């Protein structure tokens, strides 16, 4: 029993808990009240709401459909509903346009604090003033919001001038106030003409009077729907409802869209809440969602839903609503992804508004939408709809279509700040389709300007019309496709536009469909190309002049000017070549064609090159004229060079549409690419005239001009064909001016732009007259300057200087590289020709005269008038008696010439002279390439036949004379030339020894022997080595008398005979000036081997020391360079006089042949005197006497005869100086030189056999040679400045006297004069001379001056580096070898090595090799045969010649 009671209690408790929990779940009751005009049932309304499981309360929807919507019925239904059910919110909608319903609902909400939503009809209409306690919300827009949309519509269509008409309906003050505030604070140029408020309670007369004040075409109306009917009726009577007037009203006037009063005009614009896209069902659902969302937010925040008022009846208490009432949460609501918020006035914050238009069918048409504060209109141009009751229509407002194409029509966006178009632009509409599948889209307001827009504005003012402008939809000018026109032409043809203004080309096809005005712009077809960066050609440095100019320049230079200069100079009486021919300036420079070309070439390019200017007056005139030409030529070249070295931009050159690049584009690589914009006059022209060209260019068509410009710049297109006016503008405005039109805008198929009008339009004539007036007044020209002229056409690009890169100068470097390569080839060919081929060209290979030799000889013969005789080979025949005698005579002459080459020991040798003649090389043999005493390669001498070339020997005697640089010559005048058959390249010249005038004396040699005798150092008495001798040593030796060196047997005359003829050729120089080292020393010196002579069976071989003359000289003369162990020569038999008693070779030092007993080395004073003795560098043995003993031997008071060297005791001059006096025996001839000296020498030689001769002299002088080996020798001073190094034995010697007329001046002015006038007491000692032999019996021959040929190119002349056959070189003073001691059975042997690189063609000793005179004593017996050295001028490069016996005198 107890258990049953417990279970029952448990069930009951659980049931109580469940019942209590169910009561605690809140319920939200919402009432939906709708008028029965709507076809909707209560079930439909309940089905709109489904339970939302996310809510914490239950929603109970209470529906009520009413038939009566008058204010009393509405209040009754709402109060009854509230009394039966606790209502938390009400959703109310009706089908009326009575704003009184909204006012009643506003009153009920303020009394019951129940939130009420007016979603449709009168409940949603505008209320002017709501109660402060009102909780009434409306699905609609406020007065301010609708006024904003109305202003945006006027701004969209640029209706800036308007008027405002209102009634006394509540809210009109708010409407007027908002309009005024917006206009005053806006950047748009609004202009409100009138604000009119009509009182509809008064008579019609007052209303009409106020309406007459309106003059604007746009009117804003604010009133109720009933009042609007009255006002429209009155306005119609005043003509304010006609064509061109626009009325804009709010939703208050429109009301129920299903009810349209008759008085409403067609074209009425209304701003209403969106009923088309926002139906009653959607509004009911959104109303329920707003209330439930707000209740949920309140329950979440306060955990309670406030109890609603249960009855409308009772005491009216005006208490403030609680702070947590439901309507406070309904202000900011977002539901189902929609923003359903409300403003404080109870209107939606973002309402969906639409723009309605009452069309011709008297139906409301949706033409615009306002959403998210943005207005989108349907029509680009507002349709001018005329009311059906209007009798007349206004045709002055035109619809005009245009096409965007700069500079004629330029489209810009509106100003974002003002929302309108700026000044100088007009509004235009651009239509955008929503998608390609439908024609629906929206129009966007744009701003248009340009050349055609300015013309349109002028026409509008002149012709008096207004217009709406819009852009063509397909962006084309107009083309007929399948009998349907598109583009602007289609708009005009199908009367959607009255006219078309833009870059519309007039053509025949279009003229059939539309009418065109007169052309206002001349245009046609042009071609645009892009500039491309060019490259500089390698030959750009030649491009300043054309090829013909360069050819003419070289022709004038080489063939005309140079030849003329040469010819006039050659035949000029004062020219170079004439002076050579007449002998006025022998050996002087000649003026050749090459020098003429070089002179003119240097003048052209202004190079400072050494040139030889002509002397002739005529040739100087030609050169002066050429110099003037060179100035102009070089200036023109320099001025134009910079332009051609700059990288010019490359532009494709096209001559026209018929150009090959257009007609045959595949002929070019890559193919030429060109195109145009389709559906235009340009394409039509090309298609009709050039079908093949059109077929090719279709694949390169461009969508527009801008796309074409981009393709040109990026290289996708090579040329763009289009209207010339457009292309010229684009080229002028292009950034960087990279785009150009060919031919500076050359036009093909000239035509013009015109305005298209409908066929038979009444506007054609007025527009034509206006356009002609613009052209005549110059207004059209001003517009063209403003719009059609670009910056690239008016402004010149600034020329910027830039560095010339390697690319700019590549051509010049290529030329230099080619010149270097050509030089290398020429260098190789020159050496190949010189070493391998030239012998064949000169005839050596064939044995006959070569081609070059024959041509050169012929030219020389023609120029100089010299007859050339071909010397034929002598036939074999037996000699007659006279011929035999002549051969003997020639043989004797050769023997005589050879005897002069013998030294003292050879003359005193017991051997016969004929032995020397046969064994040794004769003078003429050496001339005839018969070799030297010993060949340089130690080959034995090969004897040549001397009989076949006797006459040739004589000719070669003079040929060996080198050229005289001072123009002294022997062979003057014209001489016959004969060809030597044995040597085909040698020409013989007949020589005359007769003296000629115009010869010139030699100058005084500046160098003294003391300077030449510097050596390694000096050894003082203590044996210490002193420093090298300075260059400031004694430089002058006393010379002979005035003409001591001028031989009467010489073949030239002295200068004092005809000195006046030579003054112009030679100027006196200050010979004491320091000269450069290159002038003081020779450019070459032969290498002399100074060796000991060896005996044939001698067991010992001494070392051979060689002085290398090729070493480069220095200013301070270094010691000679010696080379040991030079290759020995082949042994030969020498005379016995060269061996000592023990058969040893040169055991003691031999007596120097160039010393005299009078001038021994021991005659110098003590060491404090400036003259010092130095041992000879080739004296290897110890000396037999000391230095002090040697000095004592030199003191004496006597002198000698300068000719015969005999003793003259009364001479008080310098004891070391050569005597300037002659003895009485030598003065009897009265001549400077007597040929008898040579005869005496030869007679003496013939009076004694050679063996006895040598033996006799040796026995007589043997003791003297051993005692006097240290005596000072007297040498003839050698000339030439090219002396390399002094000899040791010449150092410290006193100077010789000077010769010629400058002797006194040199002695006075020379800084070394003190050495010449040293007091005798310092030079003479007490010791007597060791020698008492007299010199009176001795005779010495003087040498001749060198006699030079007159530069005959066919005579062998010898270089400065080559030895002379009968004279001495400039370095012979170093080459005086000492004589060996007196022994029998030894032959003289010497080895000579030439330092020149020249070698004869047969590989033997060079032709120019000669033997220096090694043993030439100054003091000999009466029978001595010798030849004295002589001096040559130091200012020239003359050689020293030995005295040769006169052939004519001997014969």
From Swiss-Prot:
Record's compositionally biased regions (Basic and acidic residues): 1055-1073, 1100-1113, 1138-1149
Main localization of the protein described in the UniProt heading: membrane
Transmembrane segments: 548-568, 618-637, 809-829
One biological process term in Gene Ontology: synaptic transmission, glutamatergic
Localization per record: Cell membrane; Postsynaptic cell membrane
Keywords per UniProt: Calcium, Cell membrane, Disulfide bond, Glycoprotein, Ion channel, Ion transport, Ligand-gated ion channel, Magnesium, Membrane, Metal-binding, Postsynaptic cell membrane, Receptor, Signal, Synapse, Transmembrane, Transmembrane helix, Transport, Zinc
Chain intervals for the UniProt region annotation (Pore-forming): 591-612
Ranges annotated as biased composition (Polar residues): 1011-1022
Sites where the protein binds L-glutamate: 503, 505, 510, 681-682, 723
Disulfide partners: 79-312, 421-447, 428-448, 737-792
Intramembrane segments: 593-612
InterPro entries xref list: ANF_lig-bd_rcpt, Glu/Gly-bd, Iono_Glu_rcpt_met, Ionotropic_Glu_rcpt, Iontro_rcpt_C, NMDAR2_C, Peripla_BP_I
Subunit structure: Heterotetramer. Forms heterotetrameric channels composed of two GluN1/zeta subunits (GRIN1), and two identical GluN2/epsilon subunits (GRIN2A, GRIN2B, GRIN2C or GRIN2D) or GluN3 subunits (GRIN3A or GRIN3B) (in vitro). In vivo, the subunit composition may depend on the expression levels of the different subunits.
Function: Component of N-methyl-D-aspartate (NMDA) receptors (NMDARs) that function as heterotetrameric, ligand-gated cation channels with high calcium permeability and voltage-dependent block by Mg(2+). MDARs participate in synaptic plasticity. Channel activation requires binding of the neurotransmitter L-glutamate to the GluN2 subunit, glycine binding to the GluN1 subunit, plus membrane depolarization to eliminate channel inhibition by Mg(2+). NMDARs mediate simultaneously the potasium efflux and the influx of calcium and sodium.
Family: Belongs to the glutamate-gated ion channel (TC 1.A.10.1) family.
Name this protein carries in UniProt: Glutamate receptor ionotropic, NMDA 2A
Organism from which the protein derives: Xenopus laevis
Gene: grin2a
């Amino acid at each position: 029993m107890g258990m049953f009671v417990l279970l029952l209690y448990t069930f009951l408790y659980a049931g109580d808990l469940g019942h209590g929990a169910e009561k605690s779940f809140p319920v939200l009751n919402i009432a939906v009240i709708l008028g029965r005009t709507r076809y909707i049932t209560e079930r439909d309304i309940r089905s709109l709401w489904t339970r939302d499981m996310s809510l914490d309360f239950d929603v109970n929807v209470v529906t009520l459909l009413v038939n009566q919507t008058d204010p009393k019925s509405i209040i009754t239904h709402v109060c009854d509903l509230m009394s039966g059910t606790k209502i938390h919110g009400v959703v109310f909608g009706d089908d009326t346009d009575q704003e009184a319903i909204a006012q009643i609902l506003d009153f009920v909400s303020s009394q019951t604090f129940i939130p009420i939503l007016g979603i449709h009809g009168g409940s949603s209409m505008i209320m002017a003033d709501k109660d402060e306690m009102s909780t009434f919300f409306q699905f609609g827009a406020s007065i301010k919001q609708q006024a904003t949309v109305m202003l945006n519509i006027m701004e969209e269509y640029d209706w800036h001038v308007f008027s405002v008409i209102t009634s006394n309906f509540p809210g009109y003050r708010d409407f007027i106030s908002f309009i005024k505030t917006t206009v005053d604070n806006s950047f748009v140029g609004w202009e409100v003409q009138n604000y009119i408020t009509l009182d509809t309670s008064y008579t019609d007369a007052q209303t009409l009077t106020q309406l007459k004040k309106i003059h604007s075409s746009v009117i804003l109306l604010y009133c109720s729907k009933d009042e609007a009917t009255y006002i429209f009726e009155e306005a119609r009577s005043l003509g304010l409802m006609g064509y061109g007037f626009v009325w804009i009203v709010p939703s208050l006037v429109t009301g129920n869209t299903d009810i349209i009063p008759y008085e409403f005009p067609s074209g009425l614009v209304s701003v209403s809440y969106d009923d088309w896209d926002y139906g009653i069902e959607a509004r009911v659902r959104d109303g329920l969602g707003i209330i439930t969302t707000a209740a949920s937010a309140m329950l979440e925040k306060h955990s309670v839903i406030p109890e609603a008022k249960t009855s409308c009846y009772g005491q009216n208490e005006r208490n403030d609503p609680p702070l947590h009432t439901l309507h406070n949460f309904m202000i900011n609501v977002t539901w189902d992804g929609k923003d359903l918020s409300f403003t404080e006035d109870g209107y939606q914050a973002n309402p969906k508004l639409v723009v309605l238009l009452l069309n011709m069918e008297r139906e409301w048409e949706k033409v615009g939408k306002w959403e998210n504060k943005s207005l989108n209109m349907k029509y680009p141009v507002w349709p001018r709809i005329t009311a059906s009751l209007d009798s007349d229509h206004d045709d002055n407002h035109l619809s005009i279509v245009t096409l965007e194409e700069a500079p004629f029509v330029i489209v810009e966006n509106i100003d974002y700040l003002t929302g309108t178009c700026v000044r100088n632009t007009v509004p235009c509409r651009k239509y955008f389709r929503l998608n390609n599948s439908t024609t629906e889209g929206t129009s966007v307001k744009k701003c248009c300007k340009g050349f055609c827009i300015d013309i349109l504005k002028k026409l509008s003012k002149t012709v008096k019309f207004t217009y709406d402008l819009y852009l063509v939809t397909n962006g084309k000018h107009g083309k007929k496709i399948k009998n349907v026109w598109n583009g602007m032409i289609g708009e005009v043809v199908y009367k959607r536009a009255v006219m078309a203004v833009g870059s519309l080309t007039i053509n025949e096809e279009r003229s059939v469909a539309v009418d065109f005005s007169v052309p206002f712009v001349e245009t046609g077809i042009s071609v645009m190309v892009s500039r491309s960066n060019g490259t500089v050609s390698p030959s750009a440095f030649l491009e300043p002049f054309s090829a013909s100019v360069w050819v003419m320049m070289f022709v004038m230079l080489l063939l005309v000017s140079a030849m003329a200069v040469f010819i006039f100079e050659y035949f000029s009486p004062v020219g170079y070549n004439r002076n050579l021919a007449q002998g006025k300036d022998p050996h002087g420079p000649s003026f050749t064609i090459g020098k003429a070309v070089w002179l003119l070439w240097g003048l052209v390019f202004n190079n400072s090159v050494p040139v030889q200017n002509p002397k002739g007056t005529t040739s100087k005139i030609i050169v002066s004229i050429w110099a003037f030409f060179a100035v102009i030529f070089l200036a023109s070249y320099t001025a134009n060079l910079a332009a051609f070295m700059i990288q010019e931009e490359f532009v494709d050159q096209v001559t026209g549409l018929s150009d090959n690049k257009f007609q045959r584009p595949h002929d070019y690589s890559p193919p030429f690419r060109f195109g145009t914009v389709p559906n235009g006059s340009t394409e039509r022209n090309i298609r009709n005239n050039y079908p093949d060209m059109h077929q090719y260019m279709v694949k390169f068509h461009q969508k527009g001009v801008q796309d074409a410009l981009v393709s040109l710049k990026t290289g996708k297109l090579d040329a763009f064909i289009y209207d010339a006016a457009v292309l010229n503008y684009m080229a002028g405005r292009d950034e960087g001016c990279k785009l150009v039109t060919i031919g500076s805008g050359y036009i093909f198929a000239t035509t013009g732009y015109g305005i298209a009008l409908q066929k038979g339009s009444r506007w054609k004539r007025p527009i034509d007259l206006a356009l002609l007036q613009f052209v005549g007044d110059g207004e059209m020209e001003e517009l063209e300057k403003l719009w059609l002229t670009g910056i690239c056409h008016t402004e010149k690009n600034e020329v910027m200087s830039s560095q010339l890169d390697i690319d700019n100068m590549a051509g010049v470097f290529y030329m230099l590289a080619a010149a270097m390569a050509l030089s290398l080839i020429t260098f190789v060919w020159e050496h190949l020709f010189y070493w391998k081929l030239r012998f064949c060209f000169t005839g050596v290979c064939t044995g006959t005269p070569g081609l070059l030799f024959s041509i050169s000889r012929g030219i020389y013969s023609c120029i100089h008038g010299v007859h050339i005789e071909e010397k034929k080979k002598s036939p074999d025949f037996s000699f007659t008696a006279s011929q035999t005698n002549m051969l003997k005579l020639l043989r004797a002459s050769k023997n005589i010439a050879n005897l002069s080459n013998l030294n003292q020991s050879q003359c005193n040798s017991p051997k016969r002279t004929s032995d020397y003649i046969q064994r040794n090389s004769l003078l003429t043999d050496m001339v005839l390439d018969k070799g030297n005493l010993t060949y340089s390669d130690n080959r034995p001498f090969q004897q040549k036949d001397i009989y076949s070339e006797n006459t040739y020997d004589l000719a070669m005697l003079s040929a060996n004379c080198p050229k005289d640089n001072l123009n002294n010559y022997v062979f003057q005048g014209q001489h016959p030339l004969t060809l030597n058959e044995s040597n085909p390249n040698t020409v013989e010249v007949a020589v005359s020894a007769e003296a000629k005038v115009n010869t010139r004396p030699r100058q005084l040699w500046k160098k003294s022997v003391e300077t030449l005798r510097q050596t390694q150092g000096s050894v003082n008495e203590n044996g210490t080595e002193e420093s090298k001798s300075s260059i400031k040593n004694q430089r002058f030796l006393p010379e002979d008398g005035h003409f001591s060196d001028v031989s009467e047997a010489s073949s030239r005359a002295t200068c004092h005979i005809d000195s006046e003829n030579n003054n112009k050729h030679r100027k006196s120089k200050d010979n004491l000036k320091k000269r450069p080292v290159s002038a003081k020393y020779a450019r070459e010196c032969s290498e002399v081997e100074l060796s000991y002579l060896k005996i044939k069976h001698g067991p010992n071989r001494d070392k051979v020391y060689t002085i290398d003359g090729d070493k480069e000289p220095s200013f301070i003369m270094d010691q000679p360079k010696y080379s040991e162990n030079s290759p020995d020569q082949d042994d030969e038999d020498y005379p016995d006089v060269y061996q000592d008693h023990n058969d040893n070779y040169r055991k003691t030092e031999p007596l120097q042949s160039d010393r005299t007993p009078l001038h021994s080395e021991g005659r110098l004073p003590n060491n404090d005197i400036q003259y010092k003795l130095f041992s000879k560098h080739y004296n290897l043995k110890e000396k037999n006497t000391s230095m002090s003993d040697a000095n004592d031997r030199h003191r004496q008071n006597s002198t000698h005869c300068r000719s015969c060297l005999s003793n003259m005791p009364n001479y008080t001059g310098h004891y070391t100086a050569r005597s300037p006096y002659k003895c009485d025996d030598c003065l009897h001839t009265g001549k400077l030189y007597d040929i008898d000296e040579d005869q005496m020498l030869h007679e003496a030689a013939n009076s004694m056999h050679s063996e006895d001769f040598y033996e006799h002299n040796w026995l007589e002088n043997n003791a003297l040679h051993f005692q006097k080996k240290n005596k000072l020798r007297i040498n003839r001073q050698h000339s030439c400045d090219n002396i390399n190094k002094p000899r040791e034995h010449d150092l410290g010697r006193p100077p010789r006297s000077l010769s010629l007329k400058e002797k006194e001046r040199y002695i006075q002015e020379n800084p070394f004069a003190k050495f010449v006038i040293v007091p005798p007491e310092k030079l003479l000692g007490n010791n007597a001379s060791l020698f008492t032999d007299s010199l009176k019996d001795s005779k010495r021959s003087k040498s001749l001056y060198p006699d030079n040929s007159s530069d005959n190119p066919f005579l062998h002349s010898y270089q400065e580096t080559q030895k002379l056959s009968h004279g001495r070189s400039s370095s012979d003073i170093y080459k005086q070898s000492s004589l060996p001691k007196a022994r029998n059975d030894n032959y003289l042997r010497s080895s000579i090595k030439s330092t020149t690189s020249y070698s004869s063609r047969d590989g033997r000793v060079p032709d120019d090799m000669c033997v220096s005179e090694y043993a030439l004593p100054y003091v000999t017996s009466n029978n001595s045969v010798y030849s004295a050295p002589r001096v040559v001028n130091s200012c020239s490069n003359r050689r020293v010649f030995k005295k040769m016996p006169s052939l004519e005198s001997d014969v």
